[in-house]
């Protein structure tokens, strides 16, 4: 139930709380050219935001719980409160949610967005590599999460892209999440540190040695780590089939 409440909190009206980076730093402008900012019109007509990342010129990866009636993707952004010359705004043609996604267990929290047109590759807009199915990220490794989410439980969302270093944890650290599945998810963030992804960062990447290994999925409502990320390597065959149009 705790995880469910946190997921529900992610899709609040824009500016009132979609997820953010806690304990991190502002990213060097345009140093993460694969980052995508999603503006979502929900089924009830509200506006929400999520993160995402470009995996081909026409596909963005994000979390399944970031789906909505309509989504516009902004690529090449650093400060989303401004209209930057580097930005490319592209509407989503099709939202492909994983067929086994379960809102209540949060399993299979992955979605691909097919853009109406291909993104133009520039120094500020580019794709990020995905892992191979055999690339099973192990506990102890230091990775990074990035996003425009809240910088604190009571803080607003960030206009500028931020990032934070996070440690991959053993599955025991996430044992209090009832439906946590080590084969499908990654337990991220040391309970000893005040560093985490939070509201507004949902759908953003977990970056390990230049490869996207995870997707921000859910965590505690009070933002205390660890949080749960979708394990991308487990979904590579499905991702490839979707991109190929199968």
Swiss-Prot record:
GO process annotations (BP): proteolysis; regulation of angiotensin levels in blood
Keywords annotated in UniProt: Disulfide bond, Hydrolase, Protease, Serine protease, Signal, Zymogen
EC number: 3.4.21.-
Disulfide pairings: 50-66, 143-208, 174-187
Active-site residues from the entry: 65, 109, 202
Regulation of activity: Also inhibited by lima bean trypsin inhibitor, soy bean trypsin inhibitor and human plasma alpha1-antichymotrypsin.
GO molecular function: peptidase activity; serine-type endopeptidase activity
Keyword Ligase belongs to the record: no
Record propeptide residues: 19-20
Oligomer status and interactors: Monomer. Interacts with iripin-2, a serine protease inhibitor from Ixodes ricinus saliva.
Protein name per UniProt: Mast cell protease 4
Protein encoded by which gene: Mcpt4
């Amino acid at each position: 139930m705790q995880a469910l409440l946190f997921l529900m909190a992610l899709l609040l009206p824009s500016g009132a709380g979609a997820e953010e980076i806690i304990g991190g730093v502002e990213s060097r402008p345009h140093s993460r050219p694969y980052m995508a900012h999603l503006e979502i019109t929900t089924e009830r007509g509200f506006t929400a935001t999520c993160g995402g990342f470009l995996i081909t010129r026409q596909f963005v990866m994000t979390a399944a719980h970031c789906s909505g009636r309509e989504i516009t993707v902004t690529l090449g952004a650093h400060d989303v409160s401004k209209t930057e010359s580097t930005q490319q705004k592209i509407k989503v043609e099709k939202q492909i949610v994983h067929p086994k996604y379960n809102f209540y267990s949060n399993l299979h929290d992955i979605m691909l967005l097919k853009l109406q047109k291909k993104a133009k590759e520039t120094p500020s807009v580019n794709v990020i590599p995905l892992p191979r199915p055999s690339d099973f990220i192990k506990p102890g490794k230091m990775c990074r999460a990035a996003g425009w989410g809240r910088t604190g439980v009571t803080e607003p969302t960030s206009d500028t892209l931020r990032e934070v270093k996070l440690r991959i944890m053993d599955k025991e650290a996430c044992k209090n999440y009832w439906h946590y599945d080590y084969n499908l998810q990654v337990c991220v963030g040391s309970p000893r540190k005040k560093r985490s992804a939070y509201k507004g960062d949902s759908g953003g990447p977990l970056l390990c040695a230049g490869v996207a290994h995870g997707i921000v999925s859910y965590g505690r409502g009070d933002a205390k780590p660890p949080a749960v990320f979708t394990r991308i390597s487990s979904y590579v065959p499905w991702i490839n089939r979707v991109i190929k149009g199968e």
